Amino acid sequence: MSFTSSKNSSYRRMFGGGSRPSSGTRYITSSTRYSLGSALRPSSARYVSASPGGVYRTKATSVRLRSSMPPMRMHDAVDFTLADAINTEFKANRTNEKVELQELNDRFANYIDKVRFLEQQNKILLAELEQLKGKGTSRLGDLYEEEMRDVRRQVDQLTNDKARVEVERDNLADDIMRLREKLQEEMLQREEAESTLQSFRQDVDNASLAGLDLERPVESLQEEIVFLKKLHDEEIRELQAQLQEQHIQIDMDVSKPDLTAALRDVRQQYESVAAKNLQEAEEWYKSKFADLSEAANRNNDALRQAKQEANEYRRQIQSLTCEVDALKGSNESLERQMREMEENFAVEAANYQDTIGRLQDEIQNMKEEMARHLREYQDLLNVKMALDIEIATYRKLLEGEESRINMPIPTFASLNLRETNIESQPIVDTHSKRTLLIKTVETRDGQVINETSQHHDDLE
């Protein structure tokens, strides 16, 4: 029996060279039968079986001799020349079969070793795959979820801080608007107070001018009063002188009319008129002076009140200006802090986005690696399936050969030679018959698609 494997077999595809995924495997077995007319017919067969430990057991080749020659007489000599030739050819075939069996055993041992190695690699890959499925993915998912929760929490905190700062900014803006409105009102009130103060100053100036105008008539009246007093005194002295002269004349001349009484009456009349005029002038002057003093006091009070209000407004303006400056400074600092927080938030958000992208890339790489491991595992499964199919095919072939070998075959020890007359019997030409069993197995991706068997008989 001879074993031939084509180049497209899965064994050569995996270990002997590359070929396409779909190939056909052709196994050719042959059995040779030798017939020698009615003399000897050797039949050879071999069987190879794989033990669990990888040890191969070979059953010996038996030779089946069948004789159709007529019985020989005991006194005739037996010619073993043909038997020696057949034994020589049988030994040569036996040697060739042993060599071929040794080669097949070596190849099968290498095949078993490679199958075991692939099974170990398959177990390692399965363990790694289970480890990745059980630990790596969940741990990475937990880390990713934890990182995402931290990022979301920080984003929410920054959003709340931003909203709080915006509310504070809006409140400060409202306070600044109210202060500006109040400042505008205070400035308007200040302008009104200044205009009122200006009008009061004008009134004071007018009152001062009126007082000056009134002081001049008073002075003129006082001068007139002094002049009238002097004139009155002169008239009184003249009248007294005249009265003395008249008294003397009266004394001298009693019969003259009484001028003293007349002068006294005139004097009384003049004095009453002068007193009345003086009293009226003093009363008018006092009333005018009282009015002017009262107006001046009122103007002074108004001026003092206006000055106090102006000072108060000035102090309020200064305090409001300080508050506005302080609020401007605090607003600028808050705006600067808000810009810094926005920049920090943007930077942190970019960093978190980069982290998320990196984690997603790592997850994608892990998924691709898992997919690659799964593909490799699937390829190994396909290879294992193809190897299992080939092993099953080998097993079927070996079982077929074993079934043929296990048939009862007589040996040389049990061979009975009968007496025959070789010279009287013609020797039939030796010929051989070869039976070819061609089995074609088509596989694709480790699966058997088609399996056919053909038998061919050739004569030699």
UniProtKB/Swiss-Prot annotation:
Gene: VIM
Region (Linker 12), start-end ranges: 240-262
Domain of life, source organism: Eukaryota
Free-text domain note: The central alpha-helical coiled-coil IF rod domain mediates elementary homodimerization.
Region: Coil 1A, residue numbers: 90-125
BP-aspect Gene Ontology terms: intermediate filament organization; positive regulation of epithelial cell migration
Coiled coil regions, renumbered to chain: 90-125, 148-239, 297-401
InterPro entries listed in its UniProt record: IF_conserved (IPR018039), IF_rod_dom (IPR039008), Intermed_filament_DNA-bd (IPR006821), Intermediate_filament (IPR050405)
Gene3D superfamilies xrefs: 1.20.5.170, Single helix bin (1.20.5.500), Vasodilator-stimulated phosphoprotein (1.20.5.1160)
Domain IF rod span(s) in chain numbering: 97-405
PANTHER family: GLIAL FIBRILLARY ACIDIC PROTEIN, VIMENTIN
Name of the molecule in the record: Vimentin
Function as written in the Swiss-Prot or TrEMBL entry: Vimentins are class-III intermediate filaments found in various non-epithelial cells, especially mesenchymal cells. Vimentin is attached to the nucleus, endoplasmic reticulum, and mitochondria, either laterally or terminally. Plays a role in cell directional movement, orientation, cell sheet organization and Golgi complex polarization at the cell migration front.
Gene Ontology terms: cellular component: axon; cell projection; cytoplasm; intermediate filament; nuclear matrix; plasma membrane
Subunit structure: Homomer assembled from elementary dimers. Component of a complex composed at least of ACTB, AP2M1, AP2A1, AP2A2, MEGF10 and VIM.
GO molecular function: structural constituent of cytoskeleton
Tail, as annotated region: 402-460
